Amino acid sequence: MEILIKNKRANFDYEIIDRFTAGIVLLGWEVKSIQAKNISLVGAFCYFKGHELFLSNAKISEYKGSRGQTDRSRKLLMHKHELKKILKEKITRKLAIIPLFIGQKNRKIKLEIALAKGKTKLDKRNLIKERDQKREAAKFLKNYY
């Protein structure tokens, strides 16, 4: 799958537990805008309405000369057994459903979603500390040898 747009905050704010691929119901101008990479997934999330899954807060910029709602909810297309599994995990383990990236597979726009658990501020601080320590160790070893 060719990745078009990534949710850059997903791996920093959440601990990814499971991944799924879903299709998205889009309008023509939305497809063109996504292919031109005019979309933001930061702050986007998925929610259940009945037995259907929807993507919310994904902002697709208007394509040239088109008019429409840029931040409407979009239905996600998945098999029923996948939806049941996601709903069961979400309820029992109290997980969030977040979009990871939008890609193109066989000229069709696909969304990679994940069941994720939110990280605390302490977890994020520790992650930053570990990253800095690794960077400094690599820098020291580079200068040492």
Swiss-Prot record:
Q: Which GO terms describe its cellular component?
A: cytosol
Q: Does the keyword Cytoplasm apply?
A: yes
Annotated localization: Cytoplasm
Segments crossing the lipid bilayer: none
A GO molecular function assigned to this protein is:
RNA binding
Cite the Gene3D superfamilies for this sequence.
2.40.280.10
Domain of life per record? Bacteria
Q: What is this protein called?
A: SsrA-binding protein
Q: Which organism is it from?
A: Mesomycoplasma hyopneumoniae (strain 232)
Q: What is the lineage of its organism?
A: Bacteria, Bacillati, Mycoplasmatota, Mycoplasmoidales, Metamycoplasmataceae
